[in-house]
Structures are given as structure tokens and as C-alpha cells.
Amino acid sequence: MKISEVDRTKLSPMMAQYMEIKDKYKEELVFYRLGDFYEMFFDDALIASRELELTLTGRVAGLEEKVPMCGVPHNNVKPYIEKLVNKGYRVAICEQLEDPRFTKGMVKRGIVDVISKGTIADNDLLNDLDSSYIASILFFSDIIVLTILDISTGYLATLSIENDEEKLINEILEYNLKEVIFIDNLNTNLIDLLKNTYGIEVTISSEFLWNKYKNLLDTIEDARVKNGIAHLFYYLDIRQLKDLSHINKINYIKKNNYLEMDIHSIRNLELIETLRLKERTYSLIWLLDKCKTAMGSRKLKTWLLSPLKDKSKINERYDKIEKLNNEFILKDELKNALYEVYDIERLAGKVINGSLNAKDLLQLKNSIKVLPTIKDISSKLGFNYCLNTHEKLYNLLDSAIVDDPPISIKEGYMIKSGYNEELDNLRDIRSGGKDFVAAFETKVKEETGIKNLKVGFNKVFGYFIEIPNGSKSLVKEEYHWERRQTLTNCERYISPALKEKESMILNAEENIIDLEYKLFCEIKNIVKQEVPLLNKTADEISDIDAIVSLSVCSEEYNLVRPTLTDEKIIKIKDGRHPVVEVVSKSEYVPNDCILEQGIDTLLITGPNMSGKSTYMRQLAIIVIMAQMGSFVPCKSATLPIIDKIFTRIGASDDLVSGESTFMVEMKEARNAIAGATEHSLILFDELGRGTATYDGMSLAQSILEYISKNIHAFTLFSTHYHELTRLDKNFKNIKNVHVSAVENGNEITFLHKIKNGSVDKSYGIHVARLAKMPDELLNRAQEILDEYETNSKKKNPCEKVQLAMDFDVQEKKEDIIKKTINSIDVLNTTPIEALNILFDLKQKIKKGEWLWI
């Protein structure tokens, strides 16, 4: 049965109320509160029963047949919401807005919250170590404005990027956005890509909210930024019923203030998760995160993904690490204090979104309790933090909240004795009930002579006098007792005196619960006023925690303070890959990386498995760690400020977009060529492997030549195309290095040491032997290799096909080739067009057509 088919005139009052609410939330699954359950009806019930594996039943609703229904318990609803939201559904929570005890007729109900992928604010449904962002995306002629919000903490940021779809997708993936809001659905290809390929929730909303948040919006000068915030706030406030009153700060993210890395580099370098298993374990953040608070972990991740370019700010972090390393006693005290701090950021968020309970207030109190200690230690260390200790708030919470409160805020037992006089009086009445029962039982026994009677209580019948069957005859009319319950072996009565006391005690219990809830709400409102200050405190605590974490790492992993220079040199002595070093079962072999005196490119050759990729990643990781403010894994390091990092490491297809290894290579190479400057770092690992040998070799050489001639970025370029090693003769900024290995018969030993010069063997068969390929296969491979090498030696050099240009060719031919290559518009040439040009050049070389070019 579908809603559209229902005759609404026949619906029961309750179902009519449901339909009225559902009409306003047609795209959401409505969780409709009925007593102790959230119920779903009609299509929502069909979807929920399928997705949550619930039993589908029916409910009488005034129609000829029952309407589909399923439900979940209200006190265990979170796992069900999480499952639905992760599957891409939005859930609207419909609560009872009146107390059924005091309501005649239908209880008023309404939607109190709408939950989607980007608006989950409940800590139980969030990863402590990750932010949860939703974003508005507005397109303008020249730029795209992203407005980003973490609803769980109130962190609001805005950034503008070039109007380029690929760059937009990169930002969406880098910030790990859960949900994005577009003003229209005209860009269907982009919307489909985000939804179907990357699993991002996409919402269309064309409205803006101006007046309600006018004070905040009036602080913004840029009209486009103002539009972005008003667009996001309309969706969150009006459509999702979120309280945004605590947001009073806008973070303006300027991309040129940070070292730029695209999502490919972040993944290739395994900064946040490993490439193969997509897990945090064995990533760089896994290694560096020694934080004691969830806030600190999130801050450290932000630093890692946004390394600084301001030398003074970087050195400020170095100074703090150095100070902590020299004050180990203070550092230990600081670590112990930080360990006592809960997630103040998200606790403040819970105050605003209404999900706060008494246990949260207790966590907040305990966090505030150690702030004076943290402030004192920070001051002794010379840290420039103006930490607010929130003394008044601490005193309030300490006097009000019991040490072990319940999770529910509607069951009482939250507020301390002595906090409220009226509450204390009610509790005296309630506790006096126990004494009354004992005294009353003794008195009745004496008055009636019924020695085996008992006075008891249960929730159904209240207080009663229980008389065994053998003593029923002793109950006299003059007692004026009223029979309440007949059991097999006894009768239960209520007397006028007991009834009066019962009313007083039970009323006290109800009044206690109501008053405690009222007091809790008053306390919550006081805390709400302090949320902006709490957020500032949380930001400073997370800074301190992240710095302490980096200090711990510097000692645990033997890291050193790098020297930052304005010169265009990289000088790393005994550099190490920190993660590989920690997880390696054998002793790690450190390596130098020297790029100075006009040398900005290392052309790396060597066997597979010898450590070329690790060496390349190692340099990038040292640069990133240095610019995030961390000490680095080496004996010494002198580094410039790098503005961008581009990487192509590892051969893989882009399965989600259906692109081949070669196409992915070409796109990433083009990004580097188009975006790199002389202050950038480029890492290309075996570029060109994804296509035919000669095509790949020609492209690899052409790309390397272009970078060396036109960009002069710091470049590490590994290859198995040994012909490329001749390039150092014509390009003085290229230096050949290789990863050494020792060959002994059929055995090979990788030394993992970078040495000057090149090698002309890849030892592929030796590596296959290490992989335990069958001997028969290996022997045949060796025969084929010997045959190729023999034939190659017999050939006249003029007959060999050499894609690496022979540097002894006549000057005219060389000039023509240069002229042809220089005429290519690299930034606007597609990979296919580039291949066609190279193919044409090759054909003309073969046919001797150069005279008429």
C-alpha cells in the first residue's frame, strides 16, 4: 500500500497526524515516536524493513487493510539510524512534543532533527579521529566557492578555487566531504560522479537564509563567500532543523598559505591510509599520532594535510618541540593532564544540537578541572596560549552534577543534593517513604493482631497491605480497607492512611524527575552561553596536544630539527622513511638526498624491490613533516619551502572512473607539468610503463626534458629505461643515481643504498626468483633474455630503434626536432594528441623526411 493511494478521509487521528508530518518530509524516512518505539509506515516501513532486516507488520489505521509498519526501540535507535544514513538515506526524527500524562486526546508530535551523511552530530555515530564535513558549493564564472562545516564541532570554513571540475573533486576528496549541496542539478555528470563513484550525498537546494544570521553575515566583505554561507545555513537550519547559533567564527582558508598536495599525492604517499588495504595502520598519521585527546588527533591530521609555507610559524612549532624535549618532567606532567581531557569540541557541539546528557556535563567538568594545570605547565614552557580555565562553569557543574549520572535525562538521579532546596525537600519525602512503610507495618500489626501481614509496593498497584488467606477473617470492616488485588495465597488491601501517603510519595517521585529535568535544562542553557569560549579553549588544547605528540615522536623515532633555507637546495643526510623503518624487520638503510649547485633532478635506476619508490616517498615525507612543524627522520636536513608536491608512484588503474594505468599516468604527469613551479617537488616512479615500450620511453624522456628545461622543479625520476641516463650529458641539472645491488650467480642482494651513477640492468629474473616462480619458467626466461641480448649486440647500431635521441646526430636534424617539440602547447595538448605527434616524428625519422619539414 502506497501513501499516494490512501483515502485520507478514512484515516485514524494518529495516522492522519503522521501523514501531515510525512507530507513535509517526503524525501526522508520518518521515525515516528509511539511510546517506547519509533515506528515507520507505508513506503518508509518497506524500505526500513528491507535495509534494517526488521519484521514487517501492519497497523490498523481506519482503512480496509492494515498499513505496512515496522519499528525500532527508542532507547537503541542509534545503530539503526547509522546504518540507514551510511546507505544514503536521510532520517527525520519525529518526537512527542507533549507529556502523554498531562495531555488529553492526541499527543502533539513534530520533527526535531533530520540526520544525513553530513549532519551526524552524535559522538556515538562519529569517528573520534576524523572531522565530518558538509559543504555548499557555488559556481561563479571564474571561481568555485566551497563553504565547509563540521556540524559536530561548529568549525566553519570557506575557500575559493579555480573554476575547474577536476580541482573541485580533489578538494571534495581531500576534505573527505560526506555531503555536498548544489544550487541546481544542471551538472548531472558531476553529481552522478560524486554520488555513484565516491558515495557522497548530493542535495539540491536553491534557497538562502539571510536575516537569522545577519550579525555573522555582516562581517563578510566578499559577497560570494556570504552567498555560500547563507546557502549552507538555509539547508541546515530550515531543512535539517540544526541550531547554528554557536557559530561565530569563519575560517578563511587561503590555499597559497599551505603546501599544496592533490588527492593522488596524499594517497600515493600514504599520509592518511595505506594504498593497498585503505587502513590507518601503517600510514604516516598512524605513526605520528600520539595525541591524548580526540581533538588533538584531528588537529594533527589537519596539520599533516595542510603543511605550512610560513617559515616563522614552522619554526615556532620547532621551538615548542625543542622546549618540550628539554623539559621532560614538564612534558610528562602535560601528557598526564591532557589524558584527562575529553572531546570538548564535540561536547560543545552536543550542547547546541540538544543531544547533551548529564554524563557529557560530567566529562566537561572533568576536562575543565585540569585546565589550570595545563595552563600552568604551558606558561612554564613559554607557550603563548591564553587558556581560559572556565572557573565559574566548573563550580556550577561541580555543585550540580552527581559523580555517576545516568545516560537518560528524564529519569532523575542527575542533580546533587544541596544544589536546589525544593529538590532536597522532595527527596526527603521520597526517602521518608521507606521509613514510613516499616513504621506503618509495625503499627498495623499491633492494631489488628495480624502478625504475618506485610506492607509492600509495586508499580502496577502501588502500596498495599498483604494478608495471607489464613488471616483474611481477621480483617474487619471498621478498618475501612479497600481490596486492591486477589492472589492465589493472599489478598491485598489499601487503607486510607496508606493511600494518602502513597499519593504524597508518588507525587514526590514524579515531581523530582520533572524538577531535575528542568534544572538540567537550566544548566545546559548556561553552558550554551559559554560554547564560543569552550571552542576557543578546545582549539588551544588541540594545538598543545598536537605539539606534544610531535615531541614524543621526535624522541621515540630519533627525529631532528631541520634547517629551513631561502636557497634552492635540499640537503638531507641519512634520511629515513619513518613508517618503513618502524615496521621493517631488518635494519633500515638510510640514504642521503642532495640537490644543490644547480642539480635539481635525480634520475634513479636500479632493480625492482631495491627501494627506489621508498627513497622517493622518503623525500616527500621529510618535506611534509618539516613543513607541518615536525622534526624529521634523518641525521640532518637543510630544506627550502616547497610550494607543491606532485607524485606518480605505483602502477594502478583508476577503477572507479574506468581509466587505464597509462591514462592515469598521463593525467598526473599533466597536473605536474601544468601546476609545478621551481619551488615544487615532483616524484615520478617509472613513468611510461603503462603503454608500449618505445611509446613509454619517448614520453618519459620528453616529460623529463620538459621539466628539466622549463620548470626546474626538484624532481626524483625513477626509470627502467636505461637509455634515459644519457640525458645528464645535455642537461646539467640532471644527476644519475642508482640503488645498488650485488649479483652472485642466480642470487641477488639488495643493498638499498643510493649511489652516484646509473645501472643498465633491472634484475627482473632475479626478482621473479625471489617471488618463488617455477624454475622451469625462470630458466626459459633466462634463455629468452640471453637471445635478446645476443641479437642486440649483433645488430648494426644504425638498425637499432633508439627512442632516446642520439646526441651525435647532425645539427640540422637536432634543430628540427627541437623546433617541433618547442612548438607543442604542452598545457593544452591531450595525451592522445601528444602520442600522435610523437608517432609522426618517429615515422619521419624512419622515412628520412626531415629535409622537407
Predicted features, each with a name:
Residues 458, 825-853:
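Terminal-proximal interaction/regulatory segments of ATP-powered molecular machines
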Residues 1-323, 336-339, 343-352, 356-442, ...:
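Charged catalytic and DNA/RNA-contacting regions of genome-maintenance
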Residues 14, 30, 446-449, 453-469:
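Extended, charged helical/alpha-beta scaffold domains that provide interaction surfaces
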Residues 94, 117-126, 243, 379-382, ...:
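Active-site phosphate-binding and catalytic loops of NTP-dependent enzymes
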Residues 487-525:
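Extended, charged coiled-coil "arm/hinge" scaffolds of SMC/Rad50-like chromosome-maintenance ATPases
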Residues 343, 353, 357, 367-370, ...:
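Charged, surface-exposed helical/loop "interaction arms" that form contiguous linear patches used
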Residues 42-45, 222, 292, 297-298, ...:
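ATPase nucleotide-binding head domains, primarily ABC-like/P-loop NTPase cores
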